[in-house]
Amino acid sequence: MVKKGAGEFKNRVDRVVKRDGRVVKFEQEKITKAVLKAFAETGEGKEAEAKKVSSKVVQLLNKNFKKGNVPEIEEIQDLVERVLMILDFEETAKAYILYREQHRKIRESEEALKEAVDLVDKYIQEIDWQVKENANMAYSLQGLNNYISSIVSSKYWLNRVYSKAIRDAHDEGDFHIHDLDKIAVYCCGWDLQDLLRRGFTGVPGKIACKPPKHLRTAIGQMVNFFYTLQGEVAGAEAFSNFDTLLAPFVRYDGLSFKEVKQCMQEFVFNVNVPTRVGFQTPFTNITLDIVPPKNMIEEAVIVGGVPQKEKYGEFQEEMNMINRAFAEVMAEGDASGRVFTFPIPTYNITRDFDWNDENLKPVWEMTAKYGIPYFANFINSDMDPDDARSMCCRLRIDNRELHKRGGGLFGANPLTGSIGVVTINLARIGYLSKNQAKGQKGRATGRAERKDFFARLDKIMDLAKESLETKRKIIDSFMKKGLYPYARFYLDNIYKRRGNYWANHFSTIGVIGMNEALKNFMGETTATEKGVKFAEEVLVYMRNKLIKYQEETGNLYNLEATPGEGTSYRLAIKDRKKYPDMIFANGQVGENEKIEPYYTNSTQLPVNHTEDFFEALDLQESLQTKYTGGTVLHGFMGERIQDAETTKKLVKTISEKYALPYFTLSPTFSICPSHGYLIGEHQLCPKCVVEQKCEVYSRIVGYIRPVEQWNKGKATEYGDRKEFVVG
């Protein structure tokens, strides 16, 4: 508390960070002059009072900032507002707040034109790290167009939609609001059966297709659906029951296996064409049932938009053909041996899964070679194949919660997803929270320090909730105005039942940097017993808070293990600038610009902790199962598993022994322009007589891309990774 009668205070803060990032000399006189201008408008004080205010600000600066930590301009101005209120200069405080806001708008207006020109240069010259923020986006004219439009959309959200508190929390790095570059929802799961029933149609003035009668037509409409709806969704799209719903078309068309494989080849090649804005491939996911789900066995099949006499349970042979053909196409790769990044297939592993099914051999080969699929564990996890659907690389949907809340959803109608995602910077909370154990490995963290940690978490989570509620209202209003015409058509049944198009879509809060939070807070990690125990406590606390949010708002919330492709780097950069002594995933990098800082994804292990996959599984199981929104454990491997049979046994062991909901096996591989696929990492082709550069591929977060396209933070993480060894 600042005492009103306090006199001059000796200043130990000698530097300040300006808005452009430059560090300059701190001058108390500038604070005095700014306050004096505000006094001139209100008449509440003169130079003596202005000096008094600036002295109190200096006093608070020295209290709040340790030696070596440098305050930012905005933080100093926040303190000026606070001191004016404490000293009862209320009118001046209001004038000062108005002054700040007016000058912010003036600065933005002046910067707008310069920014527009600079943006082109930044992209062309690849100056901005965000040029490579998304590894799915290649350097191109379309990438340039997307880069420019993304900045405009971000400014719209931050300056026209969100409150100042939310804007500041994002800009300063307390949390990260995802997909600010798009005025759209995060991800959507669509109802493939509805598409087969109605066809690709529904928007006035646009081409309308009748319900498909043939497999090739159905697949063509699926591709067009993905392409078109990707323009109305910021992130991933998904279809569930891919093999179950398409199997009847195989019989009705009288197709041979060769013809089915040709159809699958057309589908896979078409969905990997970079047609999305920014020269991206649409981010697509499909779920394969392998056997008909119990809730669909007696359901009439849809062909030509009409229910037929046969039931889905009668088409196991055709499902086998689709699954084998799809897996063979994915395992073969493209003409150069490159991996098909999309669609990401999710395979449901159930208790009655037939591990000896010969038709699934290509699945194990695809997994061993490229590591493409996700495996959904329905054996030991809390999920059920009839009511849980994989939505994208990270979003795990539990429809049972929706059912309890009147959503009326079931396995064949997965019209759900996520409105938006906000990721909490746990690393910063750990650093800022007072604790006795910092730097003293093994010491117990006291009550006061724990209280401070959870108080900070509370505050940031409440702001995240506010931002998500705001986004939901904005997106809903835009939906009603027709900004998302196809989504409005295919979500019409939800609107009829619930009175809101997005009623089944979650508001998602994620976490990043738990490992670094533990390092900074209590000298532990996600690989130590005490660290795991505290991490579990934090996740349970967050889950309970999300339940309260659901009760308060009537909207669905979930907790996600954020992928953090760009977030892990963006937040680390901000924290290094503000707190040079902070510990990152790669240690105390300080102000050394040659080392790129990054945070460990969600509550994952340090990337260099172990080569033992089963040790990692043991350490992660209790944390992975705490998420309600989505999580996956990636088994990063230095090279492919040579034997597909070993791959199958490994997947079987993990599914039967662990309760992890989702996992992958992710080998590193290379592509030579002449020799195609190469096992492991090769910067240069070992087979070429003339030296040729190779593309090195690995899974960046949820999907597989060339390492060369990764941002600097993720590229540093890749270099630090200790890959698992599988015998």
Walk through the language-model features, giving the residues of each:
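Conserved catalytic cores of very large enzyme subunits
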Residues: 102-106, 112-503, 524, 528-679, ...
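Long, charge-rich boundary regions
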Residues: 670-673, 690-727
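Charged, amphipathic alpha-helical regulatory modules used
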Residues: 2-119, 123, 722
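Well-ordered alpha-helical scaffold segments within catalytic/enzyme domains
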Residues: 515-524
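Metallocofactor- and cofactor-centric catalytic cores in central/energy metabolism, strongly enriched
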Residues: 39, 260, 264, 520, ...
